[in-house]
A protein has these predicted regions:
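Short runs within selected transmembrane alpha-helices of multi-pass transporters and secretion channels
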Residues: 4, 8, 12, 35, ...
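Residue-level signature of transmembrane alpha-helical entry/exit and packing/kink sites
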Residues: 73, 107-111, 167, 196, ...
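Helix-loop junctions and terminal segments of transmembrane helices
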Residues: 34, 38-75, 79-82, 129-134
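Alpha-helical transmembrane segments of multi-pass membrane transport and lipid-handling proteins
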Residues: 68-123, 150-158, 209-217, 290
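Helix-terminus/linker motif at the lipid-water interface of multi-pass membrane proteins
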Residues: 9-40, 56-59, 94-104, 223-227, ...
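Membrane-proximal transmembrane or re-entrant/amphipathic helices at the cytosolic face
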Residues: 184-194, 216-291
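Alpha-helical transmembrane segments and their helix-entry boundary regions
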Residues: 17, 28-29, 140-142, 167-168, ...
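Alpha-helical transmembrane segments of polytopic membrane transporters and translocases
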Residues: 2, 15-17, 29-46, 73-80, ...
Length: 291
């Protein structure tokens, strides 16, 4: 496990080394601010789930059917949230940066937009460790991390001619390219394949693409799309664009699932996680067991 975290730490800093070496301090500063916001989404959205999910998966490791059921539902909840956040930040990322950091960081906003498409997939990739650890295979996790690092580093080098924006896009491409192989490799010892992941999350991915495209079509060419300068204008753009996107997204998810099951699963997961953040209590029943 420690070896995996060591390799992962180097991978998470290689992009900074390459951008700083190839360009200049200003370019690195803009890139680093954009990356920090990108990484923050993973830590804020998946960290509260780590202990709950790992504990439940470990308890289910000797019951393959229960483990698969729990994992499928948990992946669905992560995808429900992650795909929405990723698509929405692709639409309003530059406005979020202008609101949080100020107008002088506009270049970071343009870089951050290229991280956006990878956020949802990054959240799914971050759950691969749950499988490796719950079935007692940390060595496989380390080996996969080394392969992942080699591929991602190669993409960074290939993307350098396009500047910091190219490196940001390389992150998104790497997550999208590796997510299915990552789950296939993690799930081999327990008979899970890449199709298991696809079946659990494809509706959320499709909903985010459709809702994002519809929202962009509505606002393209308007003053909102042109992102006028100013913190107040940025906040207004975020609120209007995100409201329209979320409406389309939730509606599409409900249509694709023929009902509100994803909303009930999300509510169940929130109930499971919330008590653990404010008080210690016995482990809750897995979210995968909700009817």
């Amino acid at each position: 496990v420690y070896g995996r975290f060591g390799v992962n730490y180097f991978a998470k800093n290689l992009d900074n080394l390459l951008v700083g070496w190839r360009f200049n301090a200003a370019a690195l500063g803009y890139y680093k601010k954009a990356y920090d916001l990108f990484a923050l989404s993973a830590s804020q959205l998946t960290s509260p789930l780590d202990n709950v999910a790992l504990s439940a998966l470990s308890r289910s490791s000797h019951d393959p059917d229960r483990l698969k059921r729990y994992l499928a539902n948990t992946l669905g909840v992560v995808a429900f949230i992650g795909m929405a956040v990723g698509a929405d930040l692709t639409l309003v990322g530059k406005d979020v940066v202008r609101l949080v950091l100020g107008p002088k960081w506009a270049e970071s906003g343009r870089i951050f937009e290229l991280f956006g498409p990878g956020i949802g997939v990054m959240l799914l990739c971050s759950t691969v460790g749950w499988i490796h650890l719950s079935i007692g295979k940390p060595g496989r996790w380390l080996r996969w991390t080394i392969v992942e690092f080699a591929i991602t580093a190669s993409l960074f080098v290939l993307a350098l001619p396009w500047g910091p924006k190219g490196v940001a896009a390389a992150w998104s491409v790497s997550y999208c390219a590796l997510v299915v192989p990552a789950f296939w490799y993690a799930g081999r010892p327990i008979g899970l394949g890449g199709s298991f992941l696809v079946a659990a999350v494809w509706r959320y991915a499709a909903a985010s693409l459709l809702a994002g495209a519809a929202t962009a079509a509505i606002f393209r060419g308007t003053l909102i799309w042109s992102s006028p300068a100013g913190v107040g204008a940025a906040l207004e753009t975020i609120m209007i664009t995100s409201s329209v996107f979320v409406t389309f997204y939730v509606g599409t998810v409900i249509l694709l699932h023929w009902g509100c099951a994803p909303l009930r699963q999300l509510a169940g997961l929130l109930r499971e996680v919330a008590p653990k953040r404010i008080a210690t209590s016995p482990a809750a029943e897995p979210v995968g067991e909700y009817k």
